[in-house]
């Protein structure tokens, strides 16, 4: 089946828009290396477009009506935005849903130890990483430290050009013969992913002198002591900015593009769509990389609760209205797909793979080995999606996640489908997914945004 190359469709004016969107996208990535940082930006962007905090509306008991724009944050790690349409909300919403957590390495609660005059922080990796990717490269520390009096200290060390960086060391090849005999899953063990944070001792201190020096420095410069790490969330991420990639600058290379490339384009699309007939919604959520668990993951009830609050203030304070609204909704689960890599052909079935530069990707299903754990979108919904995309000149492709018995993956799609709504995965093809630095095509980023705008505006279309 013939595929369209998105780049061929652009005139000079559109090409400028393609590159301009990626410029602002790179800024979003640089300022959002954690889920908390992404939520801060989302709130800033939303308020600039006239969105109001739902919590303030609840306090004032102000009725919600068509034309109102609302956002709701949950524990500073997830956010939902609503643009209330003129149609009865019980007829359903058009929902975009992406995740803003990414694979990384987290600092343990009791992490600090000194060995051979070197001070380390012990860690526990988060999400599906290849552990050997993370050694011998500059790393930054982002997150929060919360003291017993409730004071929250925001931490961002390693991404300013004047900041120090950190690293996880590796064994030199001259002594690495035994290490090199291990398989890739074992060549770097999880317990060996310890972050080197200092080596200078306090003068005239022979025992744990480095520990004392660093502890003094942390208290003086950052305002917390070692014991405060018990109530900290510190994330170790690659140090450095998102960059244009290729002689033609046609790609973006950056950390966290799974799934912030879809989060950003979903957010931009949501804020671009103004007066709507059918209520629109954008969800940016946490914890997808570890199964969407916990209070800030999609398996929690925070989104359902937010919808219930909105409906109550619209004069529909009953569970039936909530159920009707959710069941009648349509969703694009905005998540990335595995881009075909000609260096690793054995992992893909070429007819059903996604390709860089060929537009936004629809995954009718994900899951693994027999579609296990999958949301399998209905053919009727896929037909509706095709109609919306083609009537809006969006370049799109369809794909599966690799060969049938090789592996697979999942998204938040199956969770939202529990409400009975139509859901399909839709996002951007990525090379080197889950590596510290991932690669996307600027054409695909642009087509994703165009796709999301078209979907949000699809009010009169029936399935």
Language model features with spans:
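N-terminal hydrophobic/helix-forming segments and targeting peptides
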Residues: 1-463
């Amino acid at each position: 089946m013939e595929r369209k190359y998105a780049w061929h469709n652009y005139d000079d004016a559109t090409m400028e828009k393609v590159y301009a969107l990626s410029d602002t996208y790179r800024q979003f990535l640089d300022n959002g290396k954690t889920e908390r940082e992404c939520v801060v930006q989302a709130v800033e962007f939303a308020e600039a477009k006239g969105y109001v905090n739902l919590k303030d509306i609840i306090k004032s008991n102000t009725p919600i009506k068509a034309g109102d724009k609302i956002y709701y944050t949950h524990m500073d790690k997830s956010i939902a935005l609503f643009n209330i349409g003129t149609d009865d909300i019980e007829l359903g919403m058009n929902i975009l849903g992406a995740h803003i957590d990414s694979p990384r390495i987290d600092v343990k609660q009791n992490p600090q130890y000194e060995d051979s005059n070197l001070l380390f922080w012990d860690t526990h990796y988060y999400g599906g990483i290849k552990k050997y990717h993370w050694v011998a490269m500059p790393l930054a520390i982002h997150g929060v430290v919360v003291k017993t009096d409730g004071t929250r200290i925001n931490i961002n060390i390693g991404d300013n050009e004047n900041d120090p960086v950190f690293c996880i060391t590796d064994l030199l090849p001259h002594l690495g013969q035994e290490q090199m005999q291990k398989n890739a899953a074992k060549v770097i063990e999880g317990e060996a992913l310890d972050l080197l944070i200092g080596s200078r001792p306090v003068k005239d201190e022979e025992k744990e002198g480095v520990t004392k020096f660093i502890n003094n420095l942390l208290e003086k410069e950052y305002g917390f002591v070692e014991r405060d790490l018990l109530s900290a969330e510190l994330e170790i991420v690659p140090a450095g900015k998102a960059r244009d990639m290729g002689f033609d600058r046609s790609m973006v290379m950056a950390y966290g593009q799974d799934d912030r490339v879809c989060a950003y384009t979903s957010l931009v699309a949501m804020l671009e769509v103004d007066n709507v007939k059918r209520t629109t919604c954008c969800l940016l959520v946490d914890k997808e990389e570890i199964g969407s668990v916990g209070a800030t993951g999609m398996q929690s009830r925070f989104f359902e609760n937010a919808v219930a609050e909105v409906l109550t203030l619209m004069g529909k304070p009953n569970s039936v209205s909530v159920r009707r609204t959710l069941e009648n909704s349509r969703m694009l689960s905005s998540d990335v797909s595995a881009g075909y890599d000609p260096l690793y052909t054995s992992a893909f079935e070429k007819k059903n793979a996604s390709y860089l530069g060929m537009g936004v990707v629809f995954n009718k299903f994900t899951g693994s080995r027999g579609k296990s754990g999958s949301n399998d979108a209905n053919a009727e919904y896929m037909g509706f999606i095709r109609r919306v995309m083609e009537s809006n000149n969006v370049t799109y492709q369809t794909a599966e996640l690799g060969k049938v018995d090789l592996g697979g993956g999942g998204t938040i799609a199956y969770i939202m489908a529990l409400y009975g709504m139509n859901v399909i995965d839709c996002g951007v093809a990525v090379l080197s997914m889950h590596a510290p630095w991932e690669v996307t095509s600027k054409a695909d980023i642009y087509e994703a945004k165009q796709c999301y705008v078209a979907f949000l505006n699809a009010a009169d279309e029936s399935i």
